[in-house]
Amino acid sequence: MQIFVKTLTGKTITLEVEPSDTIENVKAKIQDKEGIPPDQQRLIFAGKQLEDGRTLSDYNIQKESTLHLVLRLRGGMQIFVKTLTGKTITLEVEPSDTIENVKAKIQDKEGIPPDQQRLIFAGKQLEDGRTLSDYNIQKESTLHLVLRLRGGMQIFVKTLTGKTITLEVEPSDTIENVKAKIQDKEGIPPDQQRLIFAGKQLEDGRTLSDYNIQKESTLHLVLRLRGGMQIFVKTLTGKTITLEVEPSDTIENVKAKIQDKEGIPPDQQRLIFAGKQLEDGRTLSDYNIQKESTLHLVLRLRGGMQIFVKTLTGKTITLEVEPSDTIENVKAKIQDKEGIPPDQQRLIFAGKQLEDGRTLSDYNIQKESTLHLVLRLRGGMQIFVKTLTGKTITLEVEPSDTIENVKAKIQDKEGIPPDQQRLIFAGKQLEDGRTLSDYNIQKESTLHLVLRLRGGMQIFVKTLTGKTITLEVEPSDTIENVKAKIQDKEGIPPDQQRLIFAGKQLEDGRTLSDYNIQKESTLHLVLRLRGGMQIFVKTLTGKTITLEVEPSDTIENVKAKIQDKEGIPPDQQRLIFAGKQLEDGRTLSDYNIQKESTLHLVLRLRGGMQIFVKTLTGKTITLEVEPSDTIENVKAKIQDKEGIPPDQQRLIFAGKQLEDGRTLSDYNIQKESTLHLVLRLRGGV
């Protein structure tokens, strides 16, 4: 195909190229035509400097595209790089060098990998693809080198519309940097962004670590409406104060403005709008407070009130408090009276556990209200609840919590009424009145949440003879229950029944709703053949294991038998037959595995690893892989996720195209490495 190269003088050169030509090849063609040495050429396309080792198709350069040629200045210049230890490094550079090039030079001198380097000039973090001249970095300028804490971290930014944005950041990033990243993702100018964390508005010049923002923290993004507005604040004496505000101001900001005008400390102010007490961390727009709205200001009484605290032993304690006291303050008063450390206290009011940072008035606790005090078994713990959609919820619980309490916490988080929740642990449905410790549920255990569909339903079971049986069931029935119903109707013992739905063999401990079996679904009943057959499993050490199996056994069943014999957990086993990796849900007969066949057992390196695949559109795909996966396997996983046939995929790592038959470990591709995916153009262009 033909492409054009435009020089700074305005001259246009025409070149004959192919999509597979490297940038290096193109520079050689320019040298042939114009006599300019490749090392003095910089080629730019779509605003990006092109790298020698990449191809035209990598950059999606098509026929009749125009590249721009910039000449490198001869001679270059010196710049200095100062590290946090105070050491200064001198580098030979050119104005046209990219920040990436500069980091490579620092790596040559100091051995610091580029991905751990952050370069700062004039208070700004420098981006890899930009050049020194883009930032007006001149000879003898000094850059500052900050090391990235390994790998950075992810934080979330939640907008008022409920959308959540994920950002890659570092503790040392300033709020200004974070706003710039949000602008890159969402297009919102930084001057219209207000970021809130823990009820505080974040200041541009401070860093995430200044605010103790850690990995997976959630910031709230509020948009500044241009212009602001006036609101009125009416006191109990009848006086009205006028304030200049913005919809994005927090209640805390408003109280500060009232203090400026009237001298009333914020902690003595309670603001009421539409009958509701306003919380410090929320904004005016959260409460739909618009221009010329009127808030009511009530002063907190200094005198306070009495409340009662009832313990599980039946003892009642009387406390002197104020509506503005936090739950933390109340716990401290209980400690003074009873000697119970606050971290062992849980306070309950109106069936809700009270949070330390909230006040009594937040919970509408009034004089002579009674709180209930429950003691924490030291420390509490976290457990996980996995839903059928695959979502995992984290709960703070204690061994003494009842299943009922746990369902209430799930309702708080997810809005699912307790009477629609069924919790399963170790294959057992959990009963409301029992505690977590009754079921030996320990920290970081995972419960499974199944939703009860209201009422029962009919399903059909079809036998191999063609007979159809009708059963009355509920979505919450286990497969074991269903087999018992079949035994009642047909006299077939459960251990001779195999039930199949949507091509999958159903497991006894799972429920119909686990498999999305709905009313009038049809299951297939297959009788287990008595007798079975033997197969062999060969390990990488050369050891051969003999197993008694049936053609109808699933690969999952086979892995369980291997675990029984050899102690290898199923999630570390990969079984290979006829060169194919076998999938858990399929049966031996699906793969035509017959008596005395030999399977090969490969151990997964514990847990596998994640890698990233970046496309030319900038999209990043995350894959679960193992070092022993071949490039062919990886392409198949990409096809599963993205629908791109393997024969149209080219994978690049460290500038090298990866070959199908080699493994990830052959190329030293480790966890969280990034591969680049280039699509093969069919034919020429």
Curated annotation (Swiss-Prot):
It comes from Homo sapiens. Disulfide bonds: none annotated. The record marks 54, 72 as: Interacts with activating enzyme. Changing residue 72 to G: No effect on ADP-ribosylation. Changing residue 48 to R: No effect on HLTF-mediated polyubiquitination of PCNA. Impairs ubiquitination by CRL2(KLHDC3) E3 ligase complex. Residues 685 form a propeptide. InterPro entries: Ubiquitin-like_dom (IPR000626), Ubiquitin-like_domsf (IPR029071), Ubiquitin_CS (IPR019954), Ubiquitin_dom (IPR019956), Ubiquitin_ubiquitin-like (IPR050158). Changing residue 65 to E: Phosphomimetic mutant that binds and activates PRKN. The record marks 68 as: Essential for function. Ubiquitin is encoded by 4 different genes. UBA52 and RPS27A genes code for a single copy of ubiquitin fused to the ribosomal proteins eL40 and eS31, respectively. UBB and UBC genes code for a polyubiquitin precursor with exact head to tail repeats, the number of repeats differ between species and strains. For the sake of clarity sequence features are annotated only for the first chain, and are not repeated for each of the following chains. This is Polyubiquitin-C. Keywords: ADP-ribosylation, Cytoplasm, Isopeptide bond, Membrane, Mitochondrion, Mitochondrion outer membrane, Nucleus, Phosphoprotein, Repeat, Ubl conjugation. Changing residue 44 to D: Impairs ubiquitination by CRL2(KLHDC3) E3 ligase complex. Impairs ubiquitination by CRL2(KLHDC3) E3 ligase complex. Belongs to the ubiquitin family.
